[in-house]
Structure formats: C-alpha cells, structure tokens
Amino acid sequence: MPVKIPDDLPAAEILESENIFVMSETRAANQDIRPMKVLILNLMPNKIETETQLLRLLGNTPLQVDVDLLRIHDKESRHTSIDHMNNFYRDFEAVRHKNYDGLIITGAPLGQVEFEDVSYWDHIREIIDWSQQHVTSVLFLCWAAHAALFHLYGLNRKLLKEKRSGVFLHKRTHRHVPLLRGFDDEFLAPHSRFAEMDVQLLKAHPALQVLTESDEAGAYMVLSTNNRNLFVMGHPEYQKSTLKDEYFRDLGAGLQPEIPQNYFRHNDPGQDPVARWYGHGSLLISNWLNYYVYQLTPYNLDDMSGITPWENEV
C-alpha cells in the first residue's frame, strides 16, 4: 500500500526514483475505496484446485476482493462435479453486461492444439474482446497469455519439441514499473507448457514491453503499454506439488515426460520438490491487484472512462 506524504515533500522525488509507491495528500484525499471486483475464467481441468490456488494469492493482499467464477461453457467437466459448476460458476451471458476491476484467465491443457482448432476458441475471443471495454486490467496466465497475444496482436507461439516443465531463473529487464516493485534482480518461477513466444518479436512490438525473462524459459512477464493487459507465461499460482502431480500423471498415462528442471531435490522424483517461487508469485499478484487494478480502476464501475492511467502518475 502507498505511503501518503505532503504534496511537495522533497523525499517524494527520491522515493519515486527508487520505485517506491508514494501518494500525494491531494490524491489520497480524493481517493474512494471499495472492494475490488475480480472475475476468474477458469479453463483448467481441475477447477477446485486452480480456483483455490488463485484465491490463496488474492487473499494474501490487504485489499478486499469480491470474486466471481466464470466458465467457458455449460458442458460437463470431466474433473469437477456438475453441482460444483452450477453452484459456483457463472455463464458469460450472466456477466457480459457488467464491468469488473480485474479479470484472470487461467492456463489450459491445450499447448499442442492450434488456436483455431480449440472447441471454444470463438468464446475465448469474445471474452477477450469484451474485457478490453469492461475490465480495468486483465491477467492472462500461460496458455491464455499465448492465446491473447495471438488474438490481440497477431503474435503466434512456436511449439517446443519437449514440454518445458520446471522452475527457472528470471531477470528483470525493466526497473521502474510498478509491477516489479519489491522484486529481486533475479527470481524463480515455475513453467509447464508445450510452446513459447519469440522474445525478440515481443520486444519489437510497439504495444508491448517485456518486463522479465529467462535464458532458459524465455519471456515471463509482458505488459501492454496501456497497462491494461498483463501476460504471464508461467504459473505463479502453482503449489509445491503441482509440477510433481503433472509429471506422475503423464507417466501414468504412458508418456515419457522429462523430469521437471530445478524442482526435485537432487533431481530425484523420489524426493520432495522444493518450492522457491512462493514469495515472488505472491508479490506478482499483489502488485498487479494493487497498482494495475486498485490504483487505476474507477470508483464507479459503470463509467470505465474513469480509469486513471499510470502515465499521469509517474
């Protein structure tokens, strides 16, 4: 949360140059506060596991968040009961008339399927287009990040020969952006995907900025220049056992998956994995929710023209 200081305090310029969040008395006096309304489009097979992971991160912030869960269609899920889906999830028709402070679209196990061949691709495109007018900030995770970059900017992914699974070291490529406040120069994050985006294509696009990347795993966090869309190529929401569960699931299915990199102790699947990304995963979600949702969203969600752009603030 911000430090409120007098409008012309000399320390303000120093703190801002260090990427410390300060707020002038004038802005603080005119700031309205209410719960943040966040919509989650859950595309993962195990709905309960994924919603729990995301709610755990959203709940680790000082903000009150009202969450709505969205499903892509009303077809029965193989891994989640129909009662759970009907009781807790909404169809798009029930929310399309609403505005939201934030939207999270999860990954999906579709890494080797062409976007146009995805059965609900038209629905995904419709929701992405809708979000650009009805949501202050959208967080796209893993497959959803690739899908949105393709739909919004025409940038296609490239398929990998082997699934990229593991925990990889990343570095910051930008310093003075609110999203990276509190981040170390290098940090770890988990990945689990069959495709990647070309880093140079992302960097060359005038509407995008690559904030963090990995020598092994490529681009990780990409932000649109209007600060409305955040694309995260990995899984900051994953728990310690998630990659392990995926690995043994694939083994049980008769596949020959590579052992997730930098994950199991001594690279031995017989030993417990080590979670070394929780801190930065939590910080990523907290910074997104605070700086790109709470600080920018209009108090009156019926008027999306009230979004406060960061360019007037930095």
Swiss-Prot record:
It catalyses: L-homoserine + succinyl-CoA = O-succinyl-L-homoserine + CoA. It holds the Pfam family HTS. GO terms for molecular function: homoserine O-acetyltransferase activity; homoserine O-succinyltransferase activity. Pathway: Amino-acid biosynthesis; L-methionine biosynthesis via de novo pathway; O-succinyl-L-homoserine from L-homoserine: step 1/1. Its EC number is 2.3.1.46. Belongs to the MetA family. Gene3D superfamilies: 3.40.50.880. The record marks S192 as: Important for substrate specificity. This is Homoserine O-succinyltransferase. It is found in: Cytoplasm. The active site is at C142 (acyl-thioester intermediate), H235 (proton acceptor), E237. Substrate binds at K163, S192, R249. One of its GO terms (cellular component) is cytoplasm. The record marks G111 as: Important for acyl-CoA specificity. Keywords: Acyltransferase, Amino-acid biosynthesis, Cytoplasm, Methionine biosynthesis, Transferase. InterPro entries: Class_I_gatase-like (IPR029062), HST_MetA (IPR005697), MetA_family (IPR033752). It is an enzyme of class 2 (transferase). Transfers a succinyl group from succinyl-CoA to L-homoserine, forming succinyl-L-homoserine. GO terms for biological process: L-methionine biosynthetic process from homoserine via O-succinyl-L-homoserine and cystathionine.
